[in-house]
Curated annotation (Swiss-Prot):
Residues that bear Phosphoserine: S185
GO cellular component: chromatin; cytosol; dendrite; neuronal cell body; nucleolus; nucleoplasm
Start and end residues of each stretch annotated as Disordered: 88-193, 279-305
Naturally occurring in which organism (per UniProt): Mus musculus (Mouse)
PTM annotation, UniProt: Ubiquitinated upon prolonged exposure to genotoxic stress, which leads to proteasomal degradation of ZNF385A and releases p53/TP53 from cell-cycle arrest target gene promoters.
Protein name: Zinc finger protein 385A
Amino acid sequence: MILGSLSRAGPLPLLRQPPIMQPPMDLKQILPFPLEPAPTLGLFSNYSTMDPVQKAVLSHTFGGPLLKTKRPVISCNVCQIRFNSQSQAEAHYKGNRHARRVKGIEAAKTRGREPSVRESGDPAPAGSIPPSGDGVAPRPVSMENGLGPAPGSPEKQPGSPSPPSVPESGQGVTKGEGGTSVPASLPGGSKEEEEKAKRLLYCALCKVAVNSLSQLEAHNKGTKHKTILEARSGLGPIKAYPRLGPPTPGEPEAPAQDRTFHCEICNVKVNSEVQLKQHISSRRHRDGVAGKPNPLLSRHKKPRGAAELAGTLTFSKELPKSLAGGLLPSPLAVAAVMAAAAGSPLSLRPAPAAPLLQGPPITHPLLHPAPGPIRTAHGPILFSPY
């Protein structure tokens, strides 16, 4: 009973007591390695001496997630081109294509800014020449030597004076440094025209656009530019004439598009400046300037060799001898004719002359007299085979 009571009373207090919660075990103390992914690589003692491929595999397996570095975008906003490397971008920025695009954008901005500047300022009086600068309104650009507006430009300012014509005597053109033709001081805005030509890099005389000032200077020193300039002024071998006859003294000189040009070197006449430029660029004119013979004239003339010339001389020397031997009778024939004439009864008759041409004798049937009452006797037949 006592044991039973003890056994009954013993477990009851144990059941009545609340269970004691044990603190959780620290996993870091149990595990021999930490859970962080990066220090996991420290387990490999020879990690620093491993192959790069093995390092990459271990880093990918045990390491943290690799952050993908965003590739920088290299592009040109002007030309709308994307590059793969910085070297490609640098090569593109140094090229002519990028430079032309940038220059075109700057020129467009300048043209768009010029009208606004002109409208904001005071209106220029009629007939006045605007100063050279960024606020100049666009108009046909003249060439560097200041010979007036470009040929073929129909628009002219109503108040601006007409460009002065270049005299034929060449007083308006002087020689400058380097042998280039530089115009003398002309009334008007010649300096402004030169500045415009240099700023816009355009030759209105030849209608040529260049990329730099050095190219423009080289073009102005070229043969084509000088030839067209001399043709306009009439100082070179190419002369300019009015198309409808000589101008009157009071009228101004006709423009270039209303004149004809004559090239004294090639003896060619053209009707416009466009045809003149084509002729100057042709091979015929270049060969004529260089002193070469005209290929059109010498195309059908073949040079005669020394053998042909010697054969011609030999033939000309032997020709009189052969003709004399064929036309003149031989001495034996003359002697036979004289002997036959002396032995014949009709010795008083003059002996017939020997035949000029040595050949077969005349056949017998041709020597019969003509039929009729009158029959003339003929002399003896010499050298007859019958």
